[in-house]
């Protein structure tokens, strides 16, 4: 039983440490880093009609990316053309 618990703990530590945390410097142009604390990934900037978040100085996005150029993120958090 103790061996099984030890194996589970080691497996969990390896899985957590092997995930790559994305930051704004790691995502290519046209992408942003979005998601929760443990599940951040690079996603494309939002297009018209897609869910978005307004740009912020911290490049910290939880639910979606800012809009592509020429669009704004409306108050209801969807991209629309200017």
From Swiss-Prot:
Signal peptide bounds: 1-18
Major subcellular location class: secreted
Subcellular location per the Swiss-Prot or TrEMBL entry: Secreted
Known tissue expression: Expressed by the venom gland.
Gene3D superfamilies: Lipase, subunit A
GO CC entries: extracellular region
Keyword Signal on entry: yes
Family: Belongs to the u-CNTX family.
Function recorded in the entry: Non-toxic to mice and insects.
Name by which UniProt lists this protein: Peptide 1
Native source species: Trittame loki
């Amino acid at each position: 039983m103790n061996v099984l618990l030890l194996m589970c703990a080691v497996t969990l530590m390896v899985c957590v440490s092997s995930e790559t945390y994305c930051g704004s410097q790691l995502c290519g142009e046209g992408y942003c880093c979005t998601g929760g604390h443990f599940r951040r990934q690079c996603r494309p900037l939002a297009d018209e009609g897609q869910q978005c978040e307004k740009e912020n100085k911290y490049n910290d996005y939880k639910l979606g990316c800012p809009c592509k150029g020429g669009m704004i993120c409306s108050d209801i958090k969807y991209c629309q053309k200017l």
